[in-house]
């Protein structure tokens, strides 16, 4: 860069610093390279598919899928994992359908969980905005976008046409929220439902509610589906679930994870550790018997999983080995490097 352009840049940077404060503009290379903080989803396979070990703090996430596919269960597992990290969590229940007994079974500390059941979409998003701006809440769930009914629609009569009201509401709210979420390092998860587009000849007719704004503002989008049933004899005891990472701004996208959600228990984590352990060679399988480091841990997956539940230190050991093998190496956090503003020369 020649001297005249360098002087012009220096003058501009000095003016920006005076007007907007120190650190308003920085050279990217002078910032410390930090590992993106994340919270586990409760599923080992999904944590690996997401690339950073879970859902990222300081970002907006969308989880969508058909009815009874496990959307709320997955978010409650995220809350349980975040609470184990000592985080504060809030649940904005626009559907008025949160079951505290089920949440407690999944490991959620309901005494520490903040819950709101707002009357209108505007109220729900305003409450979420105030919680984010407080800087004291780490995880906020909004269940669901489809239930964020605009005030005009609630006060109107049945059958009244309110074209695009919800989409405009979401677009305006996300413009306000996205910066606050980053500054507060808060994870905001929107649960969404699926609708069908009429007259689609080619491609998928499915779309999500609330317009296109959330598709753009979300750093991670997860498509969750029930692909089968888990049976014990003739009794159905859970769902076979598949989650596709359809958008990911923090790691390579388009990966998927398969796991089981057991009724009344949530994600079948030990079963997942057994399956991935066998696949990656950490757990040996001979016929129906499973063994780890030469010691038999059980006959059949159910007995082996029960053994891991009774010996959590072995489950943690296998899980750590799987994560170290499958998770990409992340850059080491440079603690000494300060966030330096561009200085005038």
From Swiss-Prot:
Keywords: ATP-binding, Cytoplasm, DNA damage, DNA recombination, DNA repair, DNA-binding, Nucleotide-binding, SOS response. SUPFAM superfamilies: P-loop containing nucleoside triphosphate hydrolases, RecA protein, C-terminal domain. One of its GO terms (biological process) is SOS response. One of its GO terms (cellular component) is cytosol. One of its GO terms (molecular function) is ATP binding. ATP binds at residues 65-72. Belongs to the RecA family. HAMAP family: RecA (MF_00268). Can catalyze the hydrolysis of ATP in the presence of single-stranded DNA, the ATP-dependent uptake of single-stranded DNA by duplex DNA, and the ATP-dependent hybridization of homologous single-stranded DNAs. It interacts with LexA causing its activation and leading to its autocatalytic cleavage. This is Protein RecA. It comes from Hahella chejuensis (strain KCTC 2396). The gene is recA.
